[in-house]
């Protein structure tokens, strides 16, 4: 399985405290929801799956940013977003591993042109949706 960035290193180098800005958090959530609309419009097949997975990763990343902001912190490193989730939600470790794998696949797509196999999406689609719903639920609890 994937190794996560050390949280202590994240705190030292990439994490800073910020004011909780509910409007900014809501705006980030809205951007993530618009990405979902795009996914729904283009549909998912063998031709589009790489870009669908990429967009799902971006949705998850945006929701992680919102989750951190809801807790009064901000990260300048995407891997620290995953590390934060792994540290604070140990019961959802398998989700953290999937997010890390999606990050890896997204980077391979963006920097090397390696397409994502449909089987990855097919195997993980339910978990991806559960991750998104769980993040939204946790953020809403923090904003109340």
Report residues per predicted region.
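Terminal alpha-helical segments
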Residues: 1-144
């Amino acid at each position: 399985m994937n190794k996560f960035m050390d949280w202590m290193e994240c705190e030292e180098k990439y994490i800073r405290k910020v004011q909780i800005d509910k409007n900014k958090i809501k705006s980030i959530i809205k951007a993530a929801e618009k990405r979902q609309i795009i996914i729904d419009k283009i549909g998912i097949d063998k031709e589009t799956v790489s870009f669908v997975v990429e967009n799902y990763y971006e949705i998850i990343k945006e929701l992680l940013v919102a989750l951190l902001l809801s807790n009064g912190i901000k990260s300048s490193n995407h891997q620290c977003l995953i590390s934060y989730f792994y540290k604070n939600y140990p019961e959802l470790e398998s989700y953290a591993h999937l997010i890390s794998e999606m990050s890896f696949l997204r980077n391979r797509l963006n920097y090397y042109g390696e397409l994502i196999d449909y089987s990855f999406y097919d195997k993980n689609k339910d978990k991806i949706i559960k991750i998104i719903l769980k993040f939204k639920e946790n953020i809403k609890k923090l904003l109340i």
